[in-house]
Amino acid sequence: MAKFCTTITLILVALVLFADFEAPTIVKAELCKRESETWSGRCVNDYQCRDHCINNDRGNDGYCAGGYPWYRSCFCFFSC
């Protein structure tokens, strides 16, 4: 009986050790940033920009950015 328990324990330990090697590899998609083609005016709210990029420009994400704080544009992220 002790031999059986030892064998089962060793098998379970081996399964746990080798389970880590079987983990799937996750590949992150490259995202490219470009200014929204359909946004008009200055961008003040990141949430509105993100919503606009996803719904109108079919992007993955978006946020307000730009060189001057008083005039920022909406930039969208797309899969490259």
Swiss-Prot record:
Any idea where this protein resides? Secreted
Q: Which GO terms describe its biological process?
A: defense response; defense response to fungus; killing of cells of another organism
Q: Which cysteines are joined by disulfide bonds?
A: 32-80, 43-64, 49-74, 53-76
The UniProt entry, under PANTHER family, shows: DEFENSIN-LIKE PROTEIN 1, DEFENSIN-LIKE PROTEIN 14-RELATED
Classification via InterPro entries: Scorpion_toxin-like_sf
Instruction: Name the family the entry cites.
Output: Belongs to the DEFL family.
Principal location listed in the UniProt entry: secreted
Please state what the protein is called.
Defensin-like protein 18
Do the record's keywords include Signal? yes
Query: Which superkingdom?
Result: Eukaryota
Q: Per its database record, what is this protein's job?
A: Confers broad-spectrum resistance to pathogens.
Q: Name one GO cellular component term.
A: extracellular region
- Give the range the annotation lists for the signal sequence: 1-29
Ordered alphabetically, the record's keywords are:
Antimicrobial, Disulfide bond, Fungicide, Plant defense, Secreted, Signal
Q: Which SUPFAM superfamilies match?
A: Scorpion toxin-like
